[in-house]
Amino acid sequence: MKVESLIEALNADFYTGVPDSLLKPLCNYLMHTYGIDRNHHIIAANEGNCVGVAAGYHMATGKYPVVYMQNSGEGNIVNPVASLLNEKVYAIPMIFIIGWRGEPGKHDEPQH
């Protein structure tokens, strides 16, 4: 799928994430389109921070945020997802785009 088609299908206007080479086309598109813009695109220090930023965006606007990351960062989102996205707590909706590292049969670095 082309990045432009993905962006159109998501119908979102706020993205936050940790850049990943597997998601380079998406990262390049976001930088070209928004740069670093607190209203549309924030690069955070780790994936858990991204979830917190995205949750704040949703609370302020009511819109669905998008978080992008590589799968090695999933452990960093456990606490914010369990506390902020849980339907019995804040029930914040969020879209995740997660790159897949460590695919069987493919040589790949665990992180970069």
Q: At which residue positions do the language-model features occur?
A:
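Thiamine diphosphate
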Residues: 1-112
